[in-house]
Amino acid sequence: MIQMQSVLDVADNSGARRVMCIKVLGGSHRRYAAIGDIIKVTVKEAIPRGKVKKGDVHSAVVVRTRKGVRRPDGAVIRFDRNAAVMLNANNQPIGTRIFGPVTRELRNEKFMKIVSLAPEVL
């Protein structure tokens, strides 16, 4: 469950290390974002010479949450940290590599590029 002011790790090589959620997109008063949802983020920590800079505002898709996601068979997939992948204006990933596992639910959300770049799909 990601909400405004939540700080997330970045799971790609866009140059950002930590981002903070400033808005959950989809609905007028939507409060929480789960895996596969798009959020607006601001970069709080970035590496030198990266594609994004500290203070930049971008869209991101949530790929891992501590809350997890429930499957139809009753299984729950949870992670140790919250993480997101930075997106450009066309909702395509900014980075060219994805770090860490992602869930199969991203396949349904039209993020096949992220699923194909990920080293592990749960």
UniProtKB/Swiss-Prot annotation:
Transmembrane segments: none annotated. One of its GO terms (cellular component) is cytosolic large ribosomal subunit. SUPFAM superfamilies: Ribosomal protein L14. The keyword rRNA-binding applies. It comes from Psychromonas ingrahamii (strain DSM 17664 / CCUG 51855 / 37). Disulfide bonds: none annotated. Binds to 23S rRNA. Forms part of two intersubunit bridges in the 70S ribosome. This is Large ribosomal subunit protein uL14. Keywords: Ribonucleoprotein, Ribosomal protein, RNA-binding, rRNA-binding. GO terms for molecular function: large ribosomal subunit rRNA binding; structural constituent of ribosome. One of its GO terms (biological process) is translation. Belongs to the universal ribosomal protein uL14 family. Part of the 50S ribosomal subunit. Forms a cluster with proteins L3 and L19. In the 70S ribosome, L14 and L19 interact and together make contacts with the 16S rRNA in bridges B5 and B8. The keyword Ribosomal protein applies. Gene3D superfamilies: Ribosomal protein L14. It comes from the Bacteria. The gene is rplN.
